[in-house]
Design a protein with these regions (language model features):
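A glycine-rich, hydrophobic/aromatic-adjacent loop/helix-cap motif
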Residues: 1-173
Length: 173
C-alpha cells in the first residue's frame, strides 16, 4: 500500500480510474506546506504548453488529494506521467493527521509560469471543485493562463488520452 499526493490531473479520481487504471481505496483532501503550485513543466508542444508542478516556497501551501493506492498503481502513475518528474517523499496534512506520501516533482530552475491548455486547466478546476478544495485555492487555479486552438486542441486531447493510458497499461508488476 502507498500514499500518493495528487496536485494536478491526479486530483481527479475519474481521471485516475479511466486513464491511468488506478483505483484508490481511499481519497481525502490534503495539503503540502511550504510549496506552491506552478505551471512550469514544459509540455510537448504549443497546444499543451505546460503542466502542473510544485516548487518550494516558504509559507505557501499546495492543496490536493491524498490517495491510498497499491504499490503497482503507484508504478502506473509514475510510468504514465513520463520521465520528467522525480518521485519525492513528502509530509502531507489532512484535517486530523499527517502522512508520509509520494508525489511527483519536476526539478527545474524555471521560475516563470507557462500557459497550460484549456483542457488541462478545466481538468484541474473540475477536480478541485468536486473534491471540495478551498474557494481561495480554486481562485488561484482559475488565474492560470490557458490556450485553446480549435481542432488542434481537440485532436491533442484524444492523443494525450491514449498516450497516458498506453503507458499505464504497460505496468503489470
Amino acid at each position: 500500500m502507498a500514499y500518493y499526493f495528487g496536485y494536478g490531473s491526479n486530483m481527479s479520481q475519474e481521471y485516475l480510474e479511466k486513464v491511468r487504471n488506478v483505483y484508490p481505496t481511499k481519497s481525502t483532501i490534503a495539503y503540502l506546506k511550504d510549496y506552491t503550485l506552478k505551471i512550469n513543466l514544459k509540455g510537448p508542444n504549443f497546444v499543451e504548453p505546460g503542466f502542473a508542478n510544485i516548487s518550494y516556497q516558504s509559507g505557501s501551501k499546495v492543496e490536493g488529494i491524498l490517495h491510498e493506492i497499491s504499490d503497482l498503481e503507484l508504478k502506473k502513475i509514475i510510468a504514465s506521467e513520463g520521465p520528467e518528474y522525480e518521485v519525492s517523499e513528502i509530509t502531507v496534512y489532512t484535517n486530523d493527521k499527517n502522512f508520509l506520501a509520494k508525489t511527483l516533482i519536476w526539478p527545474t530552475d524555471l521560475l516563470e509560469e507557462l500557459p497550460t491548455s484549456r483542457r488541462y486547466l478545466n481538468l484541474l478546476l473540475k477536480a478541485a471543485k468536486k473534491n471540495g478544495l478551498s474557494d481561495d485555492y480554486i481562485k488561484e487555479i482559475e488565474k492560470k493562463k490557458a490556450v485553446y486552438y480549435p481542432f488542434l486542441s481537440e485532436y491533442y486531447r484524444i492523443y494525450a488520452y491514449f498516450w497516458v493510458k498506453s503507458r499505464a497499461k504497460k505496468v503489470n508488476k
